[in-house]
Amino acid sequence: MTTPANAQNASKTWELSLYELHRTPQEAIMDGTEIAVSPRSLHSELMCPICLDMLKNTMTTKECLHRFCSDCIVTALRSGNKECPTCRKKLVSKRSLRPDPNFDALISKIYPSREEYEAHQDRVLIRLSRLHNQQALSSSIEEGLRMQAMHRAQRVRRPMPGSDQTATMSGGEGEPGEGEGDGEDVSSDSAPDSAPGPAPKRPRGAGAGASSVGTGGGAAGGACGGAGSEDSGDRGGTLGGGTLGPPSPPGAPSPPEPGGEIELVFRPHPLLVEKGEYCQTRYVKTTGNATVDHLSKYLALRIALERRQQQETTEPGGPGGGASDTGGPDGGGGERGVAGGGEGPEEPALPSLEGVSEKQYTIYIAPGGGAFTTLNGSLTLELVNEKFWKVSRPLELCYAPTKDPK
């Protein structure tokens, strides 16, 4: 039984793809017109899609007419990849390929010496690789320096013009004490209600040149006596007539120059501090590299000085001087009172400043008005401000005595 002729013609009909349907024929150039072709586009036309090198012994697929090197496409078919690497058309075997000597002749016409072309390509690749590596290294270094400078500018805030290298850790904006006269004025101002009589005793070493924390607290201790706090007032004298930066242990190296200043409000913990004990709000301005331990030690020293000043202010002229009224006009009664002071009540010892430690007080922060968080003593104020606060107003901290200082 024979197949009808129309059925045979239908099976041989070539089905055009959408791309082929929209193709338009190009007119052949018959004159001597020359067209400039860039080496990059020419190389892409003469390149094997498998090895990305110039075609060698060109083989063309019979169905999709894509060109490959003979070794490349044969190796691909032997590995079991029975499809065109470019368009995924099915390739049964080597019988689906045909040689393309015309394309090899075209390549030979453009590049007569293939060995010279390959040597030139190797030299170009080596030079490009070397220049690219150097340029990448220099650009990476420049980018790193630029990023470091940007982060440094964001983190370091320049201090105000005319400010001291170490900020005063006393409250307010008062002038530092300049000598004994200033210390006496502060002491007299802090105790306006005291009865006239002998001037209150001043601790030794409170002269104009005293700047140590242990013995030079007399000029500043009186500023916090009674209910009025020197930290919240305008009489902002500093310890020992000098300035009080972050306290540091004896023998420690001097602190670096501050990159910026931080203002903070120091309040007693509303839950852990009993009312009336020392419910003073302190306004402190210090450097950003001061740590939480510095604040704790400053607070312990400050409160010890306040208690010492209160005891000195309320203390009489002598332990037993008020008990004798038989003294002569030359003030001998005072000496008898002192001599007989053993019979009166024993005077309480003044608080010592030698045992002051940063472990006596714990610093807390309540970010966003939430729960209180205990701050680690090694954290700097700049890090606390960036990590917990993140608002453009003075840093607010709370303090409370440590339950079990060690």
UniProtKB/Swiss-Prot annotation:
<dbReference type="GO" id="GO:0003682">
    <property type="term" value="F:chromatin binding"/>
</dbReference>
<keyword id="KW-0539">Nucleus</keyword>
<feature type="region of interest" description="Disordered">
    <location>
        <begin position="151"/>
        <end position="263"/>
    </location>
</feature>
<feature type="compositionally biased region" description="Gly residues">
    <location>
        <begin position="317"/>
        <end position="343"/>
    </location>
</feature>
<dbReference type="GO" id="GO:0045892">
    <property type="term" value="P:negative regulation of DNA-templated transcription"/>
</dbReference>
<comment type="subunit">
    <text>Component of chromatin-associated Polycomb (PcG) complexes. Part of the E2F6.com-1 complex in G0 phase composed of E2F6, MGA, MAX, TFDP1, CBX3, BAT8, EUHMTASE1, RING1, RNF2/RING2 MBLR, L3MBTL2 and YAF2. Interacts with CBX2 and PCGF6. Component of a PRC1-like complex. Component of repressive BCOR complex containing Polycomb group subcomplex at least composed of RYBP, PCGF1, BCOR and RNF2/RING2. Interacts with PHC2, PCGF2, RNF2; CBX6, CBX7 and CBX8. Interacts with BMI1. Interacts with MN1. Interacts with USP26.</text>
</comment>
<keyword id="KW-0833">Ubl conjugation pathway</keyword>
<keyword id="KW-0805">Transcription regulation</keyword>
<protein>
    <recommendedName>
        <fullName>E3 ubiquitin-protein ligase RING1</fullName>
        <ecNumber>2.3.2.27</ecNumber>
    </recommendedName>
</protein>
<dbReference type="GO" id="GO:0035102">
    <property type="term" value="C:PRC1 complex"/>
</dbReference>
<feature type="modified residue" description="Phosphoserine">
    <location>
        <position position="232"/>
    </location>
</feature>
<feature type="region of interest" description="Disordered">
    <location>
        <begin position="309"/>
        <end position="354"/>
    </location>
</feature>
<dbReference type="GO" id="GO:0097027">
    <property type="term" value="F:ubiquitin-protein transferase activator activity"/>
</dbReference>
<feature type="region of interest" description="Necessary for transcriptional repression">
    <location>
        <begin position="30"/>
        <end position="234"/>
    </location>
</feature>
<dbReference type="GO" id="GO:0006325">
    <property type="term" value="P:chromatin organization"/>
</dbReference>
<dbReference type="GO" id="GO:0006338">
    <property type="term" value="P:chromatin remodeling"/>
</dbReference>
<dbReference type="GO" id="GO:0016604">
    <property type="term" value="C:nuclear body"/>
</dbReference>
<feature type="modified residue" description="Phosphoserine">
    <location>
        <position position="190"/>
    </location>
</feature>
<dbReference type="InterPro" id="IPR001841">
    <property type="entry name" value="Znf_RING"/>
</dbReference>
<dbReference type="GO" id="GO:0001739">
    <property type="term" value="C:sex chromatin"/>
</dbReference>
<keyword id="KW-0678">Repressor</keyword>
<dbReference type="InterPro" id="IPR013083">
    <property type="entry name" value="Znf_RING/FYVE/PHD"/>
</dbReference>
<keyword id="KW-0863">Zinc-finger</keyword>
<keyword id="KW-0808">Transferase</keyword>
<dbReference type="GO" id="GO:0016607">
    <property type="term" value="C:nuclear speck"/>
</dbReference>
<dbReference type="InterPro" id="IPR043540">
    <property type="entry name" value="RING1/RING2"/>
</dbReference>
<dbReference type="Pfam" id="PF16207">
    <property type="entry name" value="RAWUL"/>
</dbReference>
<dbReference type="Pfam" id="PF13923">
    <property type="entry name" value="zf-C3HC4_2"/>
</dbReference>
<keyword id="KW-0862">Zinc</keyword>
<feature type="modified residue" description="Phosphoserine">
    <location>
        <position position="229"/>
    </location>
</feature>
<feature type="modified residue" description="Phosphoserine">
    <location>
        <position position="187"/>
    </location>
</feature>
<feature type="modified residue" description="Phosphothreonine">
    <location>
        <position position="215"/>
    </location>
</feature>
<feature type="modified residue" description="Phosphoserine">
    <location>
        <position position="248"/>
    </location>
</feature>
<keyword id="KW-0804">Transcription</keyword>
<feature type="modified residue" description="Phosphothreonine">
    <location>
        <position position="24"/>
    </location>
</feature>
<feature type="compositionally biased region" description="Acidic residues">
    <location>
        <begin position="175"/>
        <end position="187"/>
    </location>
</feature>
<comment type="function">
    <text>Constitutes one of the E3 ubiquitin-protein ligases that mediate monoubiquitination of 'Lys-119' of histone H2A, thereby playing a central role in histone code and gene regulation. H2A 'Lys-119' ubiquitination gives a specific tag for epigenetic transcriptional repression and participates in X chromosome inactivation of female mammals. Essential component of a Polycomb group (PcG) multiprotein PRC1-like complex, a complex class required to maintain the transcriptionally repressive state of many genes, including Hox genes, throughout development.</text>
</comment>
<dbReference type="InterPro" id="IPR042741">
    <property type="entry name" value="RING1_RING-HC"/>
</dbReference>
<feature type="modified residue" description="Phosphoserine">
    <location>
        <position position="254"/>
    </location>
</feature>
<feature type="compositionally biased region" description="Pro residues">
    <location>
        <begin position="246"/>
        <end position="258"/>
    </location>
</feature>
<feature type="modified residue" description="Phosphoserine">
    <location>
        <position position="38"/>
    </location>
</feature>
<feature type="short sequence motif" description="Nuclear localization signal">
    <location>
        <begin position="201"/>
        <end position="204"/>
    </location>
</feature>
